[in-house]
Amino acid sequence: MTKKYDLHCHSTASDGVLSPTELVHRAYAQGVNVLALCDHDTIAGIDEAEIAAKEVGIELITGVEISTNWEGRGIHIVGLNFDKTHPKMTALLQSQKALREKRAVEIGDKLEKAGIPNAYDGAKALADGEVTRAHYARYLVQIGKVSNDGQAFKRYLGQGKSAFVKAEWADIPTAIETIHAAGGIAIIAHPLRYNMTGKWVRKLIVDFKAWGGDGMEMADCGQTKDQRQMLARWAKEFDLQGSVGSDFHFPCGWIELGKNLDLVDSVIPVWEKF
C-alpha cells in the first residue's frame, strides 16, 4: 500500500484552530499515514500529537516551521525528524518565541494608535500559545473591523500597512545548522508562496543549497501541474529532495490534510531519509 504523507500542518500550539489531538484525528480520517506537525517556531504541541498518533495508528514525524529573514523577506524553513530535546533547537526556539512576543506587543501598540484599543489582549484570548498575526486577524474579524482574515492583512497586518511589524528572525544558515545539529532535515516551506518572481525563487534555492539545505516542499493542495514540474526541475538541478505538505491551519474547502500531495515521479522523496 502506498503511504499518504502530509509533512506540514499547524495546531493551536501556533496559529492553527485544531488542537494537536483534533488535528491528528482529522488526518487519520483523511487517510494520512505519516504526519508532521510543524507549528511556527514551537514544538509545544508535539507531545500531545504523539499520544493521539499512537492511539489512531498514524506515524508522527517531529516537525517545526522556523521563521527566517532572507534578502529582506520572511522565508519559512521546515525542520523534520529531529531530536526535539536537542539544546541547540531548544535555544533557537526560545529566542524565536521572545522575538514573536515582542512583535505581538508592537502590533498591538500600532493597532491602538490606529484606533483599535486592547487588540493584544483580544488576540491573546484567541491564542492557545504564542500570539501570531493570524490571531490578530481573527480578532479583527471578531470585532467587525474586517470581514475576513485576508482583509485584515490587506488593511492592517500586511507589509507596508499600519500595524505591520518586521520581526528580526534568525537567518537561514542558523535555521539549517540548528536543524542538522538536532539530527533533522531542513526544507524550504512552500517556495512559490513568497510573492517572488521565478528569478528570486531560484536565487533562494541556490543560497539554501549552498548553506547545506536538504530539500523543499514540492506539493501542496493548490499547486498546478506546471508549478510542480518547475520545482522538480530545480530539485534535480540542485540535488534537493522533495517534501509534501498541506500547510493546513483550519478546515476549509480548498486546503485539507493529505489532499493532492503527490510528488512528481522524478523527485526523490524526503522520507527516504527518515
Curated annotation (Swiss-Prot):
Transmembrane segments: none annotated. It comes from the Bacteria. InterPro entries: PHP_dom, PHP_domain, Pol/His_phosphatase_N, Pol/histidinol_Pase-like. Its cofactor is Mn(2+). The keyword Cytoplasm does not apply. Pfam families: PHP. Signal peptide: none annotated. Mn(2+) 3 binds at residues 65, 76, 190. It catalyses: a ribonucleoside 3',5'-bisphosphate + H2O = a ribonucleoside 5'-phosphate + phosphate. GO terms for molecular function: 3',5'-nucleotide bisphosphate phosphatase activity; 5'-3' DNA exonuclease activity; 5'-3' RNA exonuclease activity; metal ion binding; nucleotide binding. Keywords: Exonuclease, Hydrolase, Manganese, Metal-binding, Nuclease, Nucleotide-binding. Belongs to the PHP family. TrpH/YciV subfamily. Efficiently catalyzes the hydrolysis of the 3'-phosphate from 3',5'-bis-phosphonucleotides as well as the successive hydrolysis of 5'-phosphomononucleotides from the 5'-end of short pieces of RNA and DNA, with no specificity toward the identity of the nucleotide base. Is more efficient at hydrolyzing RNA oligonucleotides than DNA oligonucleotides. This enzyme can also hydrolyze annealed DNA duplexes, albeit at a catalytic efficiency lower than that of the corresponding single-stranded oligonucleotides. This is 5'-3' exoribonuclease. It comes from Haemophilus influenzae (strain ATCC 51907 / DSM 11121 / KW20 / Rd). The lineage of its organism: Bacteria, Pseudomonadati, Pseudomonadota, Gammaproteobacteria, Pasteurellales.
